[in-house]
Amino acid sequence: MADKGSGDKLLYCSFCGKSQHEVRKLIAGPSVFICDECVELCNDIIREEIQQADSQKGASSDLPTPHEISGILDQYVIGQGQAKKALAVAVYNHYKRLRSSSGSGDVELAKSNILLIGPTGSGKTLLAQTLARLLNVPFVIADATTLTEAGYVGEDVENIIQKLLQKCDYDVDKAKQGIVYIDEIDKISRKADNPSITRDVSGEGVQQALLKLIEGTTASVPPQGGRKHPNQEFVQVDTSNILFICGGAFSGLEKVIRGRTEKGGIGFGAQVKNVDENKRDAELLHQVEPEDLIKYGLIPEFVGRLPVVATLDELDEAALVQILTEPKNALTKQFAKLFKMEGVDLEFRDDALNAIAKRALLRRTGARGLRSIIEHALLDTMYDLPSLKGVSKVVVDNALISGEGQPLLIYSEQGDQPLAAGA
């Protein structure tokens, strides 16, 4: 090591050219010198290269397998096994495609966007949200009913990409790997089988506008959420790697499928239709073909951009009871945690869970209606509980859900007492 005052000869760093008087230390080698500043710079370069290599290695190894994706979805969404399998494979292949480094001569892998078909409250949105949270990518929900063609009153389709950019603080590279869920996609179906002389700006027109966005194009988005105007610089976002998931209830689609699958005739030699009264609409939806979606009102080009079609079953009473109790964020667990903040335990009896599920079925709102039923049943209890002293437990039974009784309050030193109305 060469110190600043050693010898009469002035020494210089062989890398940056600084003299021994301009640096703190000068390290000597065989006819070579390096200063402490260059050593520190080399350490920084090596550290960055190691971090980049580790991140690339971690990116490929962190991608869960389809089995793992489906297993994580099971923790949040009850049932819908076939839809989970289709989603898991499609998402795995999509992000494997993004993380693979393909050369110029390699085969180009096309993107497989997804169409989810199922009744309201069956878990379409929750599946997409859980996938985005699992993969740690930006996620945004768009409502197809608010979209119109460019130039008309309503939201432009490029507003979807603007929302995605806002989600990730206008980090374009991060937005390019996001997931966009377009809800109520069935509401932009063509209004009639034959083209009308009046322009359909919220139906077929929106489908036409979404075509390029879903397939992959460069969208021009105003910076920081501003409105479009001339002489403005736009943020350019390539949508080729954004995964689009479209979902809708497609009410009436089962009739289209039934018309295709059940053939009949007229006359003595006609084959009599064997209409299975027990054949549920959900079973028919599993037989959906692209031609059915086209007849329903989606244009052929739009159907072609959604090659992966997954159907969700309508939830029955048993599935709704499972949704109330089994998922990680089950409603009974959420309300139990809410009551625990007051120092009170909350118990749902089995007859109460069945009653909640039956009421949700009557409302035909699926799992989405479960929370409102519980909120309504526990409204008075949550209003009075903070003012009551000594309550250790609240028990919810069938009588409370049906509106014929009050919850049982268990006090720390007394027996069961029903909560008096307006107490």
Curated annotation (Swiss-Prot):
GO terms for molecular function: ATP binding; ATP hydrolysis activity; ATP-dependent protein folding chaperone; protein dimerization activity; unfolded protein binding; zinc ion binding. The keyword Nucleotidyltransferase does not apply. GO terms for cellular component: HslUV protease complex. One of its GO terms (biological process) is cell division. The lineage of its organism: Bacteria, Pseudomonadati, Pseudomonadota, Betaproteobacteria, Nitrosomonadales. Keywords: ATP-binding, Chaperone, Metal-binding, Nucleotide-binding, Zinc. It holds the Pfam family zf-C4_ClpX. ATP-dependent specificity component of the Clp protease. It directs the protease to specific substrates. Can perform chaperone functions in the absence of ClpP. ATP binds at residues 119-126. This is ATP-dependent Clp protease ATP-binding subunit ClpX. Residues 1-54 form the ClpX-type ZB domain. It comes from Thiobacillus denitrificans (strain ATCC 25259 / T1). Gene3D superfamilies: 1.10.8.60, ClpX chaperone, C4-type zinc finger domain, P-loop containing nucleotide triphosphate hydrolases.
